[in-house]
Amino acid sequence: KHFAHFPVVYISGLEVYEYLKAKRTKVKIKHLPLSISDRYMSLFEEQITKDIDIINVGRKNKVMDEYIQQFLLKYPNTNYVHREMENGENIYYSSVHGRLGTLTAREDLLKILSRSKIAIVTSPGLDGGEQRTGGFNPVTPRVFEAAIGKCYMIGKYEKNSEYYSFGLDKLVEMPNSYIEFETIVQDELITPFNRTDDYAAFLKANL
């Protein structure tokens, strides 16, 4: 009812859009998928030294975080960068170098992703996030940012229509156990990035 007087409402999440269409909402809605600006493609073309092993720049998925903590116990020299909330600010830490500080702009976020070999990407409505999202699991901007940074992607997504529409089944490794996670991480940490063509096609299709 809050949007009834709007001429059109754009919905970025395909899952939500399909849900509202099925409910025959009286509001005129259109699907406008997530994308990323082409102004960041210059960063994609750069060759940047990757000195970070694993990065999680956003919220943490409970299961993936448990896998990471297990991995760090076994391989303590792994350089893992992650975000913590402190006094309302996003503060980034490295498991090797300690407190890194804040990232104040999206460009800073993309640059640190470009230094990372593996990025963790997940749906927000899984493993305890269901109440926050109402059970919906949209694809997040992180996959576009990780693609710009040429990071291998490991994560956890609901295999819904949006997941397949973006082709994440071909881009994101989704381990079902810690052993699978460890195997994937070990392989990707020693394998120079080799998915430039796949990522370029993904980004071009979604600019």
Residue ranges and their predicted role:
Residues 119, 139, 147-148, 152-207:
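Pol beta-like nucleotidyltransferase catalytic core
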Residues 2-168:
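Nucleotide-sugar donor-binding catalytic core of glycosyltransferases
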